[in-house]
């Protein structure tokens, strides 16, 4: 029974990557909102472009630039090579890496190496384990979660919140009752920091405060504007069941594009942290449609500590341009810092940025 469950999960993980790489699954009803913001130009930056420092700190770890390779994959055969390449890039650029959902590793042993490969390939950078909110709500034990952390020698645990994805997923788990209480139990007992992450619909400031109260140390907003996991699962549903309708046609488009834009998540949480000092230490990751280093720079100025990307970097990996893409993004970021007079990423946090009229 366990191996059957593990096989089903592995097949789903493979399907997810295939759909994300080959089907039109990005939001088309709204964007990240980052394009609505512009930096104030500094015509006398008083810094040397060659000396701009991209290094940053995240959850106590020094990193090479404020970018994370976001949670994408693992738990099936082909994922081993993908995760090895992603981890090697993370190590080369000294940036964090999150693995995809590790549910399959709890269901069977067949593809555990697709996860464990990341630590052997990236021995010195922060790596984060990953499990879903439905599994947490269902009562995963501290021991089970510790097993996932130990498997990849993780520096933290990502708990992904994905109600819209689960709603659309043919095999979805839609019982989230008791999640916040279970989350609090986990953060109080597990020996690594916990990150709460959406998968593309965003996290509001009120929810961020509840998650922080439950003990999470960081929020990955994963806002609307990048991949719509509703669209990913709708593709899989239609492939399996044809055009059998689940939702009213007049409502479906809004559901497929449901979510809070990334920039709106960032500004909301920044306002929360400014208003309520008890949330001041909450780290923030900007993800959901991050396309380049300028998006990273805007994210930092809008309140994020780092940004993260999944699909863009996975597509670059497939094209053989992963490291070139990361270098280009670093140069984008450096250019934005130069033109705002920000010699460090800490200074970039205070760079003037305005909503376009």
Curated annotation (Swiss-Prot):
Its main location: cytoplasm. Gene3D superfamilies: Aldolase class I. It comes from the Bacteria. GO terms for molecular function: FMN binding; isopentenyl-diphosphate delta-isomerase activity; magnesium ion binding; NADPH binding; oxidoreductase activity. Its cofactor is FMN; NADPH; Mg(2+). Mg(2+) binds at residue 166. InterPro entries: Aldolase_TIM, FMN-dep_DH, IPdP_isomerase. GO terms for biological process: isoprenoid biosynthetic process. Keywords: Cytoplasm, Flavoprotein, FMN, Isomerase, Isoprene biosynthesis, Magnesium, Metal-binding, NADP. It is found in: Cytoplasm. Its EC number is 5.3.3.2. The keyword Magnesium applies. Substrate binds at residues 12-13, 101-103, 165. SUPFAM superfamilies: FMN-linked oxidoreductases. It catalyses: isopentenyl diphosphate = dimethylallyl diphosphate. SMART domains: IMPDH. Belongs to the IPP isomerase type 2 family. PANTHER family: ISOPENTENYL-DIPHOSPHATE DELTA-ISOMERASE. Homooctamer. Dimer of tetramers. Involved in the biosynthesis of isoprenoids. Catalyzes the 1,3-allylic rearrangement of the homoallylic substrate isopentenyl (IPP) to its allylic isomer, dimethylallyl diphosphate (DMAPP). This is Isopentenyl-diphosphate delta-isomerase. It comes from Chlorobaculum parvum (strain DSM 263 / NCIMB 8327) (Chlorobium vibrioforme subsp. thiosulfatophilum). The gene is fni.
